[in-house]
UniProtKB/Swiss-Prot annotation:
Record-linked PANTHER family: 30S RIBOSOMAL PROTEIN S14, SMALL RIBOSOMAL SUBUNIT PROTEIN US14A
Entry annotated with the keyword RNA-binding: yes
Biological process, per Gene Ontology: translation
Region of interest (Disordered), residue spans: 28-74
Protein's name in the database: Small ribosomal subunit protein uS14A
Described purpose of this protein according to its UniProt entry: Binds 16S rRNA, required for the assembly of 30S particles and may also be responsible for determining the conformation of the 16S rRNA at the A site.
Entries under NCBIfam families matching the protein: PRK08881.1
Homology family: Belongs to the universal ribosomal protein uS14 family.
GO molecular function: rRNA binding; structural constituent of ribosome
C-alpha cells in the first residue's frame, strides 16, 4: 500500500496536467511549426518554461487503482502485477485464467 500523501499528490498532478494541457499543446505546436518565426519560437519556449512544473504529463505516475502501488503497473488492467495475480487466482478478472500446456 502506497502512502496516502503520494496517491493524493499524483491525483493533484492529474488535475494540473488536465488544466494546462491545451495551453501546452498550443505552445508546442508553435515551436514545431515551420512557418513560425524565431521570435515566436523563442517566446513560446519561454512561455512553456513559465508553466507549472507539474503541468507536464511526464510527471504523472501510473499507480495501481486498488492500493496505489507505483511499480509493476499493467496498463491493460490498471493494476499492479501482484494485484492482477491475486485477482486472477480468485477469478475476479473476466477472461483471465491460468495458462496450462
Amino acid at each position: 500500500m502506497a502512502k496516502k500523501s503520494k496517491i493524493a499528490k499524483n491525483e493533484q498532478r492529474k488535475i494540473v496536467v488536465a488544466r494546462w494541457a491545451e495551453r501546452r499543446t498550443e505552445l508546442k505546436e508553435t515551436i514545431r511549426r515551420p512557418s513560425s518565426s524565431e521570435d515566436e519560437r523563442a517566446e513560446a519556449r519561454a512561455a512553456l518554461q513559465r508553466l507549472p512544473r507539474d503541468a507536464s504529463p511526464v510527471r504523472l505516475r501510473n499507480r495501481d487503482a486498488a492500493d496505489g502501488r507505483p511499480r509493476g503497473h499493467l496498463r491493460k488492467f490498471g493494476l499492479s502485477r501482484v494485484r492482477v495475480r491475486e485477482m486472477a487466482h480468485r477469478g475476479e478478472l473476466p477472461g483471465v485464467h491460468k495458462s496450462s500446456w
